[in-house]
């Protein structure tokens, strides 16, 4: 554990889930008459998919520019519905990279040499055994679909603190406490 690939997978998958849920939360709370269509008996993802293209553009313009824009095919619910496809690993990776590309102007970082680092990248190539890539992607989506961060948005909860603690625990032990020495663990804070 705790290699660079594990770090990328954990942070990107949790960030994807966070952004998916944040996007839904913002849509449902948007100051727009269209938002009412997303809070009924139908799941918001289905209602969002059923909006016309113009309605989707209008409601997207009503939410904060601090939230990446997602299309219906980017949503976790859409991935969940495609799990039985044999090339699910490709579908998963394409979804991640498409979100990154469509939001690159705002949600990417740059190196000192002006190279853009995307929000997401293909994750299944980190699985060495190609036959295990689709099952790996299915397992990730299985974990993501059954919980929601929406309650955390109203409470301003820092969910990344637990992930950060997991990632640095071995470094602090094996490295003599030099990494993240100024970080206060969530349990103490």
Each predicted region: which residue ranges?
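Non-catalytic, mostly N-terminal accessory regions of nucleic-acid modification and defense proteins
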Residues: 1-188
């Amino acid at each position: 554990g705790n290699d660079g690939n594990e770090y990328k997978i954990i942070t990107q998958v949790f960030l994807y889930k966070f952004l998916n849920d944040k996007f839904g939360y913002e849509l449902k709370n948007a100051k727009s008459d269209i938002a009412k269509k997303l809070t009924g008996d139908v799941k918001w993802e289905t209602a969002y998919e059923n909006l016309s293209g113009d309605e989707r553009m209008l409601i997207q313009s009503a939410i904060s520019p601090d939230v990446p824009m997602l299309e219906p095919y980017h949503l976790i619910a859409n991935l969940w519905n495609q799990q039985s496809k044999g090339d699910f690993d490709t579908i998963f990776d394409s979804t991640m990279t498409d979100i990154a590309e469509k939001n690159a102007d705002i949600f990417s970082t740059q190196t000192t040499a002006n190279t853009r680092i995307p929000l997401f990248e293909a994750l299944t190539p980190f699985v060495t055994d190609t036959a295990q890539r689709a099952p790996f992607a299915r397992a990730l989506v299985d974990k993501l679909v059954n919980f929601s961060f929406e309650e955390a948005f109203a409470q301003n909860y820092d969910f990344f603190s637990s992930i950060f603690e997991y990632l640095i625990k071995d470094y602090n032990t094996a490295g003599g406490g030099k990494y993240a020495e100024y970080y206060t663990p969530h349990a103490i804070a």
